[in-house]
A protein has these predicted regions:
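A detector of single, family-specific signature residues
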Residues: 1-384
Length: 384
């Protein structure tokens, strides 16, 4: 933590413990240093939640300076490439002194937005854990029966995971037979039980030798398969929590009325933008999502545009995935996508076009608090 005066001289610099009482004491102490005090932070994650909450309780506005901007600005300060918390704090304080009017003011989110942000991040972690577990499961399955690993659609078909949680060795699968495996999988609720059982037995019949370490590998396969099943249950429960909270938001029906956006993408959207009332325009939303090209002019070279590098890594996938879904299920989006393809654009470029267009539509729906209708009047294209 660092405090500078209006000339840039350091008035106070110390390490701050992330506890409520020291934070309150520090706020009171700094308020005595000057009539007007400006606070700026470079963190908005849970690590700064206590500080931001304490400052909000004290009716103190807080500005935000991104960590990237701090890193870039620190190069011109004394110390060169050295990086310490004390130096970063001084850079933040001095940049706030000089450029405070250009820095955005943080607005505290309500509990619903905070809960959605936590739950969506938790679901992302669970999905990543599931992917890692399936990859490890495939690796172990090769040590038991490579033919079985080749035919097992572990990612797209849950029935294979159910099968491997009970049967892993080729001999056990052959001895059980198609009919028995079909009954076991059918009782477990697997829809295509017969096709999975037939493919598994066919693959098991191609291998009669026992591979080294098969017993341990089979045990690990069963353990990993059970782990995938447990993760699936946790993801389902998390989805229910996300949907329940998302439906409580007053704009839930408005957001999900746009084709291609369900409760999961809608929750991700709210988690990324916070309060939708802060969105100033469709252009701002597009720039926030990294869908608006930025100029790259220099001297006589004008009119050059390039892809932005600074944008919300949470918001862009929401708009892109919603456009990708709408292209498949909405005739208007499909026609617009196809027109861009006919112009010679590649698939990703053609998908970004409806994603950019959807920012205009979504902003207008949120602004007017109305749901999307197929026969709604067209919304004017934005300049960006």
């Amino acid at each position: 933590m660092c405090v500078v005066d209006d000339t840039g001289a350091v008035v106070l610099s110390r390490k701050l413990v992330n506890d409520e009482q020291p934070i309150r004491e520090l706020v009171a102490e700094i308020d005595q240093l000057a009539e007007e005090v400006s606070w700026t932070v470079d963190l908005t994650t849970v690590y700064a939640a206590l500080l931001l909450t304490a400052l909000a309780a004290a009716d103190t506005p807080v500005r935000y300076l991104s960590g990237r901007a701090v890193w870039q600005a620190s190069a011109v300060y004394r110390g060169g490439e050295a990086k310490t918390d004390a130096k970063d704090a001084r850079v933040i304080a001095d940049q706030s002194r000089m450029r405070g009017a250009d820095l955005p003011v943080l607005a505290p989110d309500d509990d619903l937005i905070t809960e959605l942000r936590m739950l969506t991040a938790h679901r992302t972690d669970l999905v990543a854990d599931r992917t890692r577990t399936i990859n490890r499961l495939r690796q172990q399955l090769v040590a038991v029966c490579p033919a079985l690993e080749r035919v097992a659609a572990l990612t797209s078909d849950r029935g294979w995971v159910m099968l491997l949680s009970r049967y892993q060795r080729p001999k056990a699968i052959r001895n059980s037979g198609v009919s028995r495996l079909t009954k076991i999988l059918g009782d477990a609720g697997v829809r295509n039980a017969a096709s999975i059982a037939d493919a598994a037995v066919t693959a098991a019949k191609t291998q009669t030798v026992r591979l080294p370490g098969e017993e341990v590998a089979a045990h690990l396969v069963a353990e990993l398969a059970q782990g995938v099943i447990a993760l699936d249950a946790r993801i389902t429960a998390t989805d229910a929590d996300i949907e329940g909270r998302f439906r409580r938001h007053p704009l839930a029906e408005v957001i999900t009325s746009l084709p291609g956006i369900g409760f999961r993408l809608g929750a991700e959207f709210l988690a990324a933008v916070g309060d939708p009332a802060r969105i100033g325009s469709a252009d701002q939303l597009a720039a926030w999502a990294g869908l608006a090209p930025v100029p790259s002019d220099s001297g006589k070279r004008t009119g050059r545009l390039h892809t932005p590098q600074r944008y919300s890594r949470r918001l862009r996938p929401v708009m892109y995935m919603s456009a990708l879904t709408a292209i498949r299920c909405d005739p208007q989006s499909r026609a617009y996508y196809q027109s861009k393809r006919d112009e010679g654009k590649q698939s990703i470029q053609a998908t970004i076009c409806p994603a950019r267009r959807r920012t205009n539509v979504l902003y207008a729906l949120i602004r007017d608090n109305r749901t999307w209708q197929p026969d709604s009047p067209p919304i004017a294209e934005s300049a960006a």
